[in-house]
Each structure stands twice: as C-alpha cells, then as structure tokens.
Amino acid sequence: MTVKEYTKSKLPCSILNIKPTVTKSGEDAPLLVWIPGNPGLLYYYQEMLHHLHLKHPDWEILGISHAGMTLNAHSNTPIFSLQDQVDHQVEVINNFSCKNRKIIIMGHSVGAYIVQKVCLSNKLVGSVQKVGLVTPTVMDIHTSEMGIKMTAALRYIPPLAHVVSLFSYIFFYWILSEGFSRFIIDKFMGCGSTGYQAVLSTRIFLTHRQFVRQSLGLAAQEMEEITTNWEFQDRFINYCEENGISIWFLFSSNDHWVSGKTRSHLSDYYKDKVKQERLKIDVTDKIPHSFVVKHAEYAINAFF
C-alpha cells in the first residue's frame, strides 16, 4: 500500500492502488477513485486511503496523483493545466475500469472540481454511482480568505510559481539539513505526533522545484477558472440526476479556501436542484481544509 510510479499514462504521475480483501465471486469490486487537491501529491493521502480500505475492504481503491507530481518527473516538466489534469485522470481511471463497472469517485479541494469535470467527460469508462466532494473548491475560490491572498500575490508577482519554486529548492534542498527542514515544517504546519507523514510529504514537495512550480502554476489557473459558474454546476447536477448518481459534500465550517457565503450558496442550490435521497451535505468544525495532515482517521471514521 505505497505510492508507486505509474508508467501507463501519457503524463508522468504516481498512483496508490489497494486491492479489495473482501470480494464477491462473479463481479468486479466497486472502484473508489481518489483525486487529491493541490499540490496533488499522493504521499499526503497514504494514511487516509489506508483507513478508507480498512473501513471498506470490498472496494478497490485507486488514488491518482496530479500529472507531473511524481518523483520521476523531469525537472523541466511543464506546468499542466486544469484541463490537462482532467484528461489525465480520465485516462488513468479508464485503465482500471471497464464498461458498467461501478465507480465511486471523490476529490479533495480542487480535486473535487476535477471530479466534476471527469464525470462530465464523454471519454470516461464505467458507471459512476456516487460522487464525493470533500472541502471542495468548486466555485469562487478567489473570494475565500486564502484565495484573496493568492490572487493578490499573483497580481504583484506574476511569475510567482517560478520565483517560489527556485527559492524553495535552494532553501530546503541546499541550505537546510534534512532534519532541520523537517523541524521547521513540523512547527510551521503544527503537525505534532500524528502528522509525521505530512511532514515527510511536505519536505518532498518543497525540495522538488518542479512540484512547487506545478502547484503554484495550477493555483494561478484555479483563481481564474473556478469562479461563479452556475451553468457548469447545473450541467453536473443534471448529469447526476439523469444517471441516478448520489452526491455527497463534506464542508469544513472553518475552511480558509471556501468562504462561508460560497458554502451556503452551494448547499442551498444543490438542495433545490437534487432529489433529497441522492444528496448528503455534511458541515463540520472538527476538520480543517487540509484534514489529511492530522485528521485523516477521524474524517474517515466519522464521514466516509
């Protein structure tokens, strides 16, 4: 159950694939697809996906990194767009799916927006049964607390992705020792004893220039594309209604990337448009936006 390089896709990536330990003869296990949020590194989600497997041993679990977010990616790997990420996810999912195979697809943060796009792709193979949108940045990300700061930073420093990636590489790879960099990351993120994997994942992220460049490059596009777009939400809702797909939202009430206004508007809109039996909306103050840092086990046991 480790993150591995995946070589069967057009764009460089890694996957975490956990086979079911409880099976039914004569039928494929449901395929749970997990799409991470930005920066798209699967290392952050190893613990979470492990706990998800323990809770649902009859599922095959497939975590797919963002394109470019793998250790074997070349340092000159270009910044892949949101559409590149959508096409990439569809390609990898299709390599594990087949016609009529039951798919449960979930995404975290911008991964939730990618999930919506993936579902609407006419190239996706399989039968989507349920969609999970976890601390989702699917609309008006630029109006959130962190979105406002990110938009301002990009306005004043247009080449932000390239500047920060260079600084991060020099500082965390060349100047700081591994032990001291872990110490700084731990203190800055407040990981504590339960966030060791998050510290390791963040150090991997910060010491690979192409990861930081890809992450901030994608974030810049998120600020421009993920705005007010009820027409897109209508398309997604109609697709789910026509195909009998259940929709689940998990919101954090103290999310710095999703404003309270956006959360309320989305919740009210979906309640008006989606049949009650196919919609579940959870709002909690028990997890932050980046719940996988210290709250992975709790989130899985409480909500998934």
Swiss-Prot record:
A single GO BP: triglyceride catabolic process
Domain of life (superkingdom): Eukaryota
GO molecular function: hydrolase activity, acting on ester bonds; triacylglycerol lipase activity
Matches recorded under PROSITE patterns: LIPASE_SER
More info: Present with 2190 molecules/cell in log phase SD medium.
Motif (GXSXG): 107-111
Pfam families in the record: LIDHydrolase
Consequence of gene loss (knockout): Accumulates lipid droplets.
Family, per entry: Belongs to the AB hydrolase superfamily. LDAH family.
Alphabetical UniProt keywords: Glycoprotein, Hydrolase, Lipid droplet, Membrane
Active-site residues from the entry: 109 (nucleophile)
Annotated protein name in UniProt: Lipid droplet-associated triacylglycerol lipase
Biological role: Shows both triacylglycerol (TAG) lipase and ester hydrolase activities. May play a role in TAG homeostasis.
Catalytic activity, as annotated: a triacylglycerol + H2O = a diacylglycerol + a fatty acid + H(+)
This enzyme's EC code(s): 3.1.1.3
Intramembrane region spans per record: 156-176
Thermal dependence of catalysis: Optimum temperature is 30X degrees Celsius.
Subcellular location: Lipid droplet; Membrane
InterPro entries in UniProt: AB_hydrolase_fold (IPR029058), LDAH (IPR019363)
Residues modified by glycosylation: 95
A Gene Ontology cellular-component term: membrane
Membrane topology, Lumenal segments: 1-155, 177-304
UniProt keyword Glycoprotein present: yes
Topology of this chain in the membrane: Peripheral membrane protein
